[in-house]
Regions:
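Membrane-embedded alpha-helical bundles of multi-pass transporters/translocases
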Residues: 2-466
Length: 466
């Protein structure tokens, strides 16, 4: 049946609203991915490899909760607000509260087993339950806001900008607030960090509510109960394994997260430990954010002309080569290091600006391939990959920090500092290059095929509404 309800057209309000959604996401996600390891190694005195193991265990839990939430979204009935938006308002409070609970420095005097158990429980609740229950609907909502490829690219860009603004707060402002000077060294203050975590949680709730208020779901394609029953979880997973576009973008995104989060996590060690200057970490974020801003300006016109996957190959290869240069040159001047990292962030920024539009391309491709639209399920699998990338990074970083002998008592020894620099440059270099190769040789949705798929689905959906 044709829907006669007048829906306001896609506009700037949707872009801003969607931007606030990722701002809210990253107020807890980036705080965790960038500082949780540092908080537990330096404040709670838990070995890095243990923190990494807990994060990796949580990702196995996500294998079930992410997919389950995706199916819940696909089976949700359409409401006046849409199918995905209600979850954002419903779950913004719980995710913010549990995020705050993860950073309780007052518990640092507990026995180590108790601290490990506390981290495990709160991290599972935050990431595998509450963050999943808000992030899956939020990501799935992009394809429901508009079916126009240019609109979706705009949403992808504004989503990344929201993450950038959150990143500016997390990576630039937080380091200025959480360190004290002790014996000439920059040492993290647990009490200050707990307060900062509370402020980040409050900001997350505000941003989520703005996202809910400003966006509109327009594409109301919904699978019937019979289709969902026929295409059950087993069939969905079987189709996913055969979906070259989905699997390749999942693997590519894992390497993207490894490169990005390694740089972010290791910044907490490179600047205060290797360069002996935690203040530069905050200033460096401003410069690196400049690289992302330039990427935001040029990504959309370049993607429209050459294709999203095509420009991502070039940008990630540039970032990989620069990271290798850093590893071999090993600049002793911190500002030379920051200048070269600027180029890495520019390369990463181009891919970050288009990656969410790539996911909507994959959702379209899956609908054509399988005959059913499953925004929630496809996005859930991708979200699981992102969390897996986060866990692999934390596990890898934690293991490598333990391998080089990093502890609270050895944090400023010469050999340990050299190991910190190795991790911060070589791991991203390898990941950037592998990401570029995957997009070029494995990922099938280049510009020509994407344009054909969009036109096919537009005709299909218009015919269905008649």
């Amino acid at each position: 049946m044709k829907n006669d309800k007048i829906v306001k057209p896609f506009g700037f309000k949707d872009k801003i609203g969607y931007m606030f959604g990722d701002f809210g996401n990253d107020m807890t996600f980036l705080l965790s991915s960038s500082f949780l390891m540092k908080f537990y190694t330096d404040v709670m005195d838990v070995d890095g490899y243990i923190v990494g193991i807990i994060m990796m265990i949580a990702r196995f839990v996500d294998a079930f909760t992410d997919v389950a939430m995706g199916r819940i979204c696909d089976k949700s009935k359409m409401t006046a607000a849409g199918k995905f938006k209600p979850w954002i308002r419903r779950m913004c409070g719980p995710v913010a509260i549990v995020s705050f609970l993860m950073y309780q420095s007052s518990l640092s005097g507990l026995p180590k087993p108790a601290k490990i158990a506390y981290l495990f429980v709160t991290y599972i609740l935050w990431g595998s339950v509450f963050y999943t229950s808000i992030n899956i609907p939020y990501g799935s909502m992009a394809s429901a806001i508009s079916d126009n490829p240019n609109d979706r690219q705009s949403l992808s860009t504004f989503r990344t900008m929201g993450g950038m603004f959150a990143g500016a707060i997390i990576m630039a402002v937080v380091p200025l607030l959480i360190y004290n000077k002790e014996n000439g060294n920059d040492v993290i203050s647990g009490a200050k960090f707990t307060v900062v975590a509370g402020v980040c949680s409050l900001l997350a709730v505000v941003c989520y509510l703005l996202c809910y208020s400003l966006t509109t779901e327009r594409v109301r394609a919904q699978a019937t109960d019979a289709q969902l029953e026929k295409n059950n979880l087993g069939v969905m997973l079987k189709n996913a394994v055969k979906n070259r576009a989905l699997i390749s973008i999942i693997v590519a995104s894992i390497f993207m997260l490894i490169s990005q989060l390694t740089i972010q996590q290791m910044a907490n060690y490179v600047f205060p430990n290797y360069y002996g200057n935690a203040k530069v970490q905050s200033l460096s974020v401003v410069m690196m954010g400049g690289g992302m801003v330039i990427a935001a300006v040029i990504a959309k016109p370049l993607a429209a002309k050459f294709g999203k996957a095509e420009i991502s190959v070039v940008s990630n290869m540039v970032a990989g080569v620069v990271s290798l240069l850093l590893y071999f040159v090993r600049p002793q001047n911190v500002w030379v290091y920051v200048a070269l990292q600027f180029l890495c962030w520019f390369g990463l920024g181009v891919f970050s600006m288009v990656v969410w539009a790539l996911i909507t391309d994959v959702i379209d491709y899956s609908e054509i391939k399988n005959g059913i639209r499953e925004d929630g399920s496809v996005y859930a699998l991708y979200s699981f990959a992102r969390k897996l990338g986060q866990a692999l990074t934390s596990g890898l970083s934690g293991a490598l920090l333990s391998m080089i002998g990093y502890k609270k008592s050895t944090a400023f020894e010469s050999q340990v500092k050299e190991g910190i620099f190795d991790i911060s440059t070589l791991v991203p270099a390898i990941s950037f290059i592998l990401l570029a190769l995957i997009l070029w040789f494995w990922y099938p949705l280049k510009k020509k095929l994407v344009d054909e798929n969009v036109e096919f689905l537009r005709k299909k959906h218009n015919k269905t509404e008649e």
